[in-house]
């Protein structure tokens, strides 16, 4: 934990922002660019379907990594925890890999690019970021399983709300 004393009633907010803000920003950022270079290079998987689909581009991935990294720099500076900067970068990359994994699963299920798959669409990135923290064995993270559960519920709700806002603002073509 940082050098600051945080009262118990605010600790969850601190914890949530520290561990999930960078992955959330990374996951939300690719929509800011209209990429043309597909991550799957238009390759077809052995089942005859695209690996990820037309909406997963290198430009979006790079913007996601950059925005997640910038967020982790901010968090690291605010919390006086420089080591968090690399941890946040890693969680951002894992979040984007989680999003790709979700797209891979959707293609296997014959769900077209841009079409919804509830729960997977909202939580794939957060589950991969969670797995990343477990891989690293970050005690402050893994010691709070209820915080993880609460966080996933909050992320699910936030994802639905922010996607609807982005749709109504014209940033996204679909509400999901």
From Swiss-Prot:
Protein's pathway: Membrane lipid metabolism; glycerophospholipid metabolism
GO biological process, one term: glycerophospholipid biosynthetic process
One GO CC term, this protein: plasma membrane
Lipid bilayer topology: Multi-pass membrane protein
Subcellular location: Cell membrane
Keyword set includes Magnesium: yes
Broad class of the protein's primary localization: membrane
Domain of life: Archaea
Known cofactor(s): Mg(2+)
Transmembrane regions listed in the UniProt entry: 12-32, 60-80, 85-105, 118-138, 141-161
InterPro entries the UniProt entry points to: CarS, CarS_archaea
Keywords: Cell membrane, Lipid biosynthesis, Lipid metabolism, Magnesium, Membrane, Phospholipid biosynthesis, Phospholipid metabolism, Transferase, Transmembrane, Transmembrane helix
Enzyme Commission number: 2.7.7.67
Entry's Gene Ontology molecular function annotations: CDP-2,3-bis-(O-geranylgeranyl)-sn-glycerol synthase activity
Catalytic reaction annotation: 2,3-bis-O-(geranylgeranyl)-sn-glycerol 1-phosphate + CTP + H(+) = CDP-2,3-bis-O-(geranylgeranyl)-sn-glycerol + diphosphate
Family assignment from sequence similarity: Belongs to the CDP-archaeol synthase family.
Function: Catalyzes the formation of CDP-2,3-bis-(O-geranylgeranyl)-sn-glycerol (CDP-archaeol) from 2,3-bis-(O-geranylgeranyl)-sn-glycerol 1-phosphate (DGGGP) and CTP. This reaction is the third ether-bond-formation step in the biosynthesis of archaeal membrane lipids.
Protein name: CDP-archaeol synthase
Gene: carS
């Amino acid at each position: 934990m940082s050098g600051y004393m945080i009262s118990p009633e605010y600790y969850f907010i601190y914890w949530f922002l520290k561990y999930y803000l960078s992955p959330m920003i990374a996951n939300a950022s690719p929509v800011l660019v209209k990429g043309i270079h597909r991550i799957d290079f238009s390759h077809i998987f052995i089942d005859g379907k695209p690996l990820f689909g037309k909406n997963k581009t290198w430009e979006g991935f790079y913007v996601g990594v950059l925005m997640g990294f910038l967020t982790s720099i901010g968090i690291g500076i605010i919390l006086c925890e420089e080591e968090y900067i690399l941890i946040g970068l890693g969680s951002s990359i894992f979040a984007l890999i989680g999003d790709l994994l979700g797209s891979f699963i959707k293609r296997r299920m014959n769900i077209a690019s841009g079409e919804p798959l509830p729960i997977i669409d909202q939580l794939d990135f957060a589950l991969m970021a969670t797995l990343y923290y477990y891989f690293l064995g970050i005690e402050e993270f893994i010691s709070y399983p209820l915080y993880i559960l609460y966080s996933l519920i909050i992320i699910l709700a936030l994802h639905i709300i922010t996607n609807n806002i982005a749709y109504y603002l014209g940033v996204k073509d679909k509400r999901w």
